[in-house]
């Protein structure tokens, strides 16, 4: 991690959720991945400097060899992103404490082909972000984060030799206090109404057939 400039590393492990599966299929979303990884760096510049060192090259080879043992490279993608916390009603003690029961939806977002990246990101962050904030209570949403891609030759150079595929146009993460809270929220008529409003807005700027989502628990490695 340190040799590559990594400052934080979190694994999101998929857990079964008939409720979220129904939510996804109702939107005609694609099949989701088995897990996702989030890695933090201080900046693109710091990451680029770290990756230029001999130690980083050696560490990268070790990681690549290990990845081949349990992942399918052609199904993996990566991008450098900037987080936008739209709202956060989860106390840190609740999210990371010993009694942490939080779960989150990890959603790869793809834009409609006629939109450029700037128009898509503005529509997603401002228009849709405000709508999600308004409908958070009936949906049981406690925290909502959008991650927007930023240009990174370093990440492209890291992903290319590994044969990774094209990354999505963004990532959505939505937290619930617990799996039980998600189930309770999704069973309420108010959630169905709010979900329909969100879906009507989503199709104006996302490509549903490429979007994927799964329910996960966070595992903070460091």
Predicted segment positions?
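Macromolecular interaction modules
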Residues: 1-222
């Amino acid at each position: 991690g340190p040799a590559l400039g990594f400052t934080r590393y979190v694994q999101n492990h998929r857990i079964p959720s008939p409720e979220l599966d129904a939510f996804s299929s109702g939107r005609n979303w694609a099949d989701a991945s088995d897990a996702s990884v989030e890695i933090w760096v201080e900046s693109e510049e710091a990451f680029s400097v770290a990756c230029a060192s001999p130690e980083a090259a050696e560490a990268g080879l070790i990681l690549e060899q290990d990845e081949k043992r349990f992942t399918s490279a052609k199904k993996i993608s990566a991008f450098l992103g900037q987080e936008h916390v739209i709202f956060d009603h989860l106390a840190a003690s609740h999210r990371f404490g010993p009694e942490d029961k939080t779960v989150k939806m990890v959603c790869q977002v793809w834009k409609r082909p006629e939109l450029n990246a700037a128009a898509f990101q503005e529509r997603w962050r401002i228009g849709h972000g405000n709508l999600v904030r308004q409908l958070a209570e009936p949906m049981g949403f406690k925290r909502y984060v959008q991650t927007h891609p930023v240009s990174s030759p370093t990440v492209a150079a890291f992903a290319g030799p590994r044969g990774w595929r094209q990354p999505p146009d963004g990532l959505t993460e939505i937290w619930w206090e617990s799996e039980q809270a998600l189930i309770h929220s999704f069973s309420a008529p108010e959630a169905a109404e709010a979900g329909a409003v969100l879906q009507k807005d989503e199709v104006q700027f996302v490509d549903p057939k490429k979007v994927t989502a799964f329910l996960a628990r966070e595992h903070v490695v460091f």
